[in-house]
């Protein structure tokens, strides 16, 4: 699959946010929102440890912050670029927010190999496959760089 310069930049921003999360003491994940028109709108890191909120995964933080700062309508039809494959909770949150496309770097297996457990084995595409309206899910964009970030490199 080939990606545009904006898509590559969006994933790079998500990986940079993952590095920032690690430096802050959080699990190294980040996410970027790109509008339906192709504009990069927002970037968010994981904030589970720093907030004490087990739901503060990067994708959920992204949805919350965009809703609060830009309005929920900016989420509809947009794409999320995630440094790691979104979990079931994040996949559901993105669906309910109206996200139409999810692109991730490191797969669930990559994450398990790099970080260990706990593991919720439901993969993003499996969670979203029966969704109506459909949500497109793609993986592997900048995978090696994201895996290196997960491993602390």
PLM features: what roles do these ranges have?
Residues 29-38:
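Short beta-strand scaffold segments in enzyme catalytic cores
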């Amino acid at each position: 699959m080939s990606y545009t310069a904006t898509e590559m930049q969006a994933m790079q921003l998500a990986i940079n946010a993952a590095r920032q999360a690690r430096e802050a003491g959080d699990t190294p994940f980040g996410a970027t929102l790109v509008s339906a028109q192709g504009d990069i709108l927002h970037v968010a890191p994981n904030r589970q440890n720093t907030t004490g909120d087990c739901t503060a995964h990067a994708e959920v933080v992204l949805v919350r912050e965009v809703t609060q700062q830009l309005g929920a309508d900016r989420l509809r039809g947009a794409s999320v670029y995630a440094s790691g494959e979104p979990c079931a909770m994040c996949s559901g949150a993105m669906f309910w927010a109206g996200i139409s496309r999810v692109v991730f770097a490191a797969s669930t297996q990559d994450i398990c190999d790099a970080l260990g457990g706990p593991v919720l084995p439901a993969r993003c595409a499996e969670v979203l496959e029966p969704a109506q309206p459909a949500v497109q899910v793609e993986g592997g964009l900048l995978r090696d760089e994201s895996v290196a970030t997960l491993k602390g490199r």
